[in-house]
């Protein structure tokens, strides 16, 4: 995964609460487990005027001009600002895959659904919790200023506005470490590869019968 240290990017405001995973990436796109290629179908039922299907050429589809991500001022946005309980509904890791593939590096909201929140960290996407009052204020500033950007400083755990104001946010230390180092669960495990090999060597000496079938099956 790409490390997340500091990120400055354009903010897109999705002014909706309780956005569920079926809205983020509809069920017909869940057959693939490639992790990539979902960006064009992010918020599919809101972005387009027709019904999306896997492998469609989205460049030829009629778009909904009123949807925020179709508006010219938010093209290239990498930070999504939204409302409480984002990512609720059924569990599907495709939701953070679609957000990441679209180009988002972080999502700011007052709260997230637990499973979605956990899945974001596993895929290098930062779900960042601010207070309702702070989110309300950011919505007003984003809508009033085209080209509005925020800077997210993960080491300092701060969100900085164009005016220089800083909002503090909390994050679990282990998850912070994984994002800073760009490590997913496999990468974190491989950091302990030497310890794992040493443990296996000790176990092979202490209980060789446990490894007999493995050796015979080589």
Swiss-Prot record:
SUPFAM superfamilies assigned: LeuD/IlvD-like
A Gene Ontology BP annotation from the UniProt entry: L-leucine biosynthetic process
Keywords: Amino-acid biosynthesis, Branched-chain amino acid biosynthesis, Leucine biosynthesis, Lyase
Pfam families: Aconitase_C (PF00694)
A GO molecular function held by the record: 3-isopropylmalate dehydratase activity
Enzyme class: lyase
One Gene Ontology term, aspect cellular component: 3-isopropylmalate dehydratase complex
Catalytic activity: (2R,3S)-3-isopropylmalate = (2S)-2-isopropylmalate
Pathway annotation from the record: Amino-acid biosynthesis; L-leucine biosynthesis; L-leucine from 3-methyl-2-oxobutanoate: step 2/4
EC number: 4.2.1.33
Superkingdom per UniProt: Bacteria
Family listed: Belongs to the LeuD family. LeuD type 1 subfamily.
Reported function: Catalyzes the isomerization between 2-isopropylmalate and 3-isopropylmalate, via the formation of 2-isopropylmaleate.
Subunit structure, as described in the record: Heterodimer of LeuC and LeuD.
Name of the protein in question: 3-isopropylmalate dehydratase small subunit
Gene name per UniProt: leuD
């Amino acid at each position: 995964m790409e490390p997340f240290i500091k990120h400055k990017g354009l903010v897109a405001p999705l002014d909706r609460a309780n956005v569920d995973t079926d809205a983020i990436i509809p069920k017909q796109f869940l057959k693939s487990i490639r992790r990539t290629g979902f960006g064009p179908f992010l918020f599919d039922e809101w972005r387009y005027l027709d019904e999306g299907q896997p492998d469609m050429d989205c460049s030829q589809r009629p778009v909904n001009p009123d949807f925020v991500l179709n508006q010219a001022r938010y093209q290239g946005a990498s930070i999504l600002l939204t409302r409480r309980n984002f990512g609720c509904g059924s569990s599907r890791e495709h939701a953070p895959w679609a957000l990441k593939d679209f180009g988002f590096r972080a999502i700011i909201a007052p709260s997230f659904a637990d499973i979605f929140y956990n899945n974001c960290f596993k895929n290098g996407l930062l779900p960042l919790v601010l207070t309702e009052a702070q989110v309300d204020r950011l919505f007003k500033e984003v809508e009033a200023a085209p080209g509005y950007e925020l800077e997210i400083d993960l080491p300092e755990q701060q969100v900085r506005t164009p005016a220089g104001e800083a909002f503090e946010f909390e994050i679990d230390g282990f998850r912070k470490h994984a994002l800073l180092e760009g490590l997913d669960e496999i990468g974190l495990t491989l950091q302990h590869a030497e310890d794992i090999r040493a443990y296996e060597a000790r176990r092979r000496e202490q209980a060789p019968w446990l490894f007999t079938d493995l050796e015979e099956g080589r």
